[in-house]
A protein has these predicted regions:
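Long, compositionally biased charged/polar accessory segments in the mid-to-C-terminal portions
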Residues: 580-628, 634-637, 643-644
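Soluble C-terminal extramembrane regulatory/interaction domains of multi-pass membrane proteins
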Residues: 177-181, 185-202, 245-368, 553, ...
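A transmembrane helix-and-boundary motif of multi-pass membrane transporters/channels
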Residues: 1-233, 240, 350-607, 709-724
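Helix-boundary capping/turn motifs
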Residues: 70, 95, 390-391, 613, ...
Length: 724
């Protein structure tokens, strides 16, 4: 007979479970000594707040307490005034939950926990208090005290006893992101593999692997941005580097469209000239050498100045018999994007050094305000649908409760509110709700054992610890494993929630079964209403993300076509709005990748590669906004207006093919710039770079621009701008 194999738990998992259980028992002890009516609320709170990283525990503690305070205050204000009108009270509490849920979905960071908790806390306190509104204030105060004790104990134990800092996690993700960006740049700068001049990177690279690497980089940037929300709460010196980390996120995000643009410009040069020309190959080799020396810390200012001179020389290429106007335009665009990469990489290196200094206790330098998380993709329509589903589910349970006079109908409304909120960020929350329900059903026998058998036999605190330890310690071990977190949390939530809702001294089997039926009914109602109102497929969600991108591109071009761009110098340095668009597009790429994979790797009308193209497009439109004074006014307005019209029609589903007139307008504007005498200025080169990018992104299969279209034309001279 084979030996029974027991799971092996790591030291970190054992430490996490032990700290969580110790915090739970401390909270239970303090709540009992204080005479609070439901001390198991404190126990449940310690596990809800628990996290392997101390910084995440502290931030969740702050957010949870604020949400609890807001929710309990709303309950005290609403329930007494409406206790004599149960139908109206149910509607008002449902609307409150829906409003808070909608607000929470507008913030895709852990801060959203405040609003979500404010919503369902009102349901957890308000609905059970309907039958005794005179005791509502005392009940609300008791819940805040019990939850506050749980938060305090969890924060204390996880912060003081073997605290797990966020440094390895955050810095590991940060360095992996930098390494991926550096690898991408290194791939682009590889020298030609043979005399034909064809770069080695295109000869031996797997396109699918490269595409996966690009999408992983986008996902890592967004994940880092969300995870860094916890950094100011960390227990180590890492918290002093929060500003540098946020600034570095913005810098890496801004590098991505430039990396993608360089890759496309090299491909275009190879297609136009048959191979990478010697002058371009020499520049790539010089840039690659500088990058290697910069990474090794051996680069000096002379090497950087020499590289800048080479970039300037390529950008100043004059037309001759061997270089066509299109080849010249591609060289100007390539030089401009490589210059961005060089300066951006140097900024990233400085910020990484500042972070290392901050970890040693040095005061980090003051940073320009980062973009933060406000620029992440938001789907307001889905947020409103999620709120509507929560309102309808609560009203359905409330109507059944009122019509039947069911004594435990409050449990159904509570569970409907909680489960509609928990899974609102998913495209289709129903499978997750059903999975949670399955494990909640498995928790019922354990809850019955505690409520009906074990707890009535407990006569002192030592016995309580001994009774709780086996189940809660084991579930805590599995909570520390990401693969088992959801089942363990569902079981723990089911057991501790049942204990919190019952008076364990007077509970009987009838009240227990009644309460369990109410909870199950509420979860089923949440799943039913969500499936009817809110569930969508991955393909539907991916198309919404793509249409949001097209609408934003139309707005960017339309704003430029309507009014002159008047960005302040500080705004130009921060890269607003172009850098904000880059962050949002990287977030969308990270959102699209799993949805395309979930749909079997293919969604009609949605290609993952198109997202990178749209990312470059936004950078080019933003650059053209800044330097539009370099173009004749009529030409700039007509071009940007056509681009805005095209993307608005595309977002509305009214056009699929790119109009040939748009290609003609781009070629006309590009010809005027190449034929002008002012192409030596930074703004003029930026205009050429943006126009080349628009042509390549909108018409990648179009033949090179004809030489005959390039004629000298007068172009207004503008003040020097920021080179893009």
């Amino acid at each position: 007979m084979p030996a029974l194999s027991l799971p092996r738990f790591s030291r970190a998992e054992i430490v996490f479970s032990t700290k969580s259980f110790a915090a739970a028992m401390l909270a239970m002890y303090l709540a009992s000594r204080a005479g609070l009516p439901r001390p198991f609320w404190a126990l449940m709170t310690t596990y809800v707040v628990a996290h392997p990283l101390a910084g995440a525990v502290r931030s969740k503690a702050v957010y949870r307490f604020c949400g609890t305070l807001i929710g309990s205050t709303a309950t005290v204000l609403l329930v007494p005034a409406l206790s004599n009108a149960p139908e109206l009270l149910t509607l008002v509490l449902a609307l409150w939950v829906g409003l808070c849920l909608c607000i929470s979905l507008f913030d895709r960071t852990p801060r959203s926990y405040v609003f979500m908790l404010a919503g369902y806390t009102a349901a957890l306190i308000g609905f059970p208090s309907v039958q005794a509104p005179e005791a509502l204030f005392d009940t609300a105060v008791a819940r805040v005290e019990e939850i506050g004790l749980g938060i305090f104990c969890a924060t204390l134990l996880h912060s003081l006893v073997l605290p797990a800092g966020m440094g390895p996690t955050v810095l590991g993700l940060l360095d992996r992101t930098l390494q991926d960006a550096r690898k991408w740049l290194g791939d682009l700068l590889q020298p030609p593999a043979s005399a034909t001049g064809t770069p080695a990177r295109r000869a031996d690279a797997d396109p699918r692997r490269l595409a996966d690497d690009r999408r992983r980089l986008a996902g890592d940037i967004t994940q880092l941005r969300i995870l860094s929300t916890h950094v100011p709460f960390d227990t180590t010196h890492l918290r002093w580097t929060a500003g540098a980390i946020r600034a570095m996120q913005d810098r890496v995000a801004a590098l991505t469209p430039a990396l993608s643009a360089v890759e496309d410009r090299l491909l275009a040069l190879e297609q136009a000239e048959g191979a990478i020309a010697p002058d371009v190959a020499a520049l790539l080799a010089q840039t690659g050498q500088w990058l290697r020396e910069e990474g090794a810390g051996t680069s000096d200012d002379a090497r950087l100045q020499a590289l800048r001179a080479t970039l300037a020389a390529l950008a100043a290429t004059r037309p001759d018999a061997s270089i066509s106007p299109w080849g010249r335009a591609l060289r100007i665009a390539l030089a401009g994007r490589l210059e961005e990469l060089v300066e951006g990489w140097r900024a990233c290196a400085r910020l990484r050094a500042d972070i290392d200094d901050g970890l040693k206790g040095a005061v980090p330098p003051r940073r320009v305000a980062a973009l933060g998380n406000r620029v992440l993709h938001l789907d307001r329509g889905m947020a409103l649908l999620s709120a509507l589903a929560a309102v309808l589910a609560i009203c359905l349970c409330g109507a059944f409760w009122i019509l039947t006079g069911w004594s435990m109908g409050s449990a159904a409304t509570m569970m409907a509110a909680v489960f509609c909120c928990f899974f609102a960020t998913m495209d289709d929350p129903v499978p997750a709700i059903q999975g949670f329900l399955k494990w909640t059903l498995w928790s019922i026998p354990i809850s019955a054992l505690y409520v009906l058998v074990l707890l009535p036999l407990v006569h002192d605190f030592g016995m309580l610890v001994a009774v709780c330890a086996p189940v809660f310690m084991l579930l805590g071990l599995y909570m520390a494993r990401p693969a088992y977190f959801m089942p363990a949390m569902a079981l723990l939530f089911g057991v501790s929630g049942t204990l919190a809702m019952h008076d364990t001294a007077t509970a009987d089997i009838v009240s227990f079964i009644n309460s369990m039926l109410g909870q199950v009914f509420g979860v089923v109602a949440a799943a039913f209403v969500t499936r009817l109102v809110r569930s969508v497929g991955a393909d539907w969600s991916a198309r919404r993300i793509q249409r949001a991108t097209w609408r934003e591109l139309g707005e960017m071009a339309g704003a430029a076509a309507a009014t002159p761009v008047t960005l302040s110098p500080s705004a130009q340095r921060r890269g607003v709005p172009g850098d904000a668009y880059a962050v949002r597009m990287l977030d969308r790429i990270g959102l699209l990748a799993p949805r395309i994979a979930q749909a079997g790797g293919r969604i009609e009308g949605v290609a993952a590669d198109d997202a990178l193209r749209d990312l470059r497009m936004g950078a080019d439109i933003d650059a053209l906004q800044r330097v539009r004074a370099q173009l004749p006014l009529a030409s700039a307005s007509a071009l940007l207006g056509d681009i805005a019209r095209f993307f608005r029609q595309r977002a509305g589903g009214r056009v699929a093919a790119r109009p040939a007139s748009l290609l003609a307008r781009i070629d006309e504007a590009l010809a005027s710039m190449l034929g002008a005498a002012s192409t030596s200025s930074a703004d003029a080169r930026s205009a050429v770079t943006a126009l080349v990018g628009l042509r390549r992104n909108l018409f990648p299969e179009a033949p090179p621009m004809r030489a005959a279209s390039v004629v000298p034309v007068p172009v207004p001279v503008a003040a020097q701008g920021v080179s893009r």
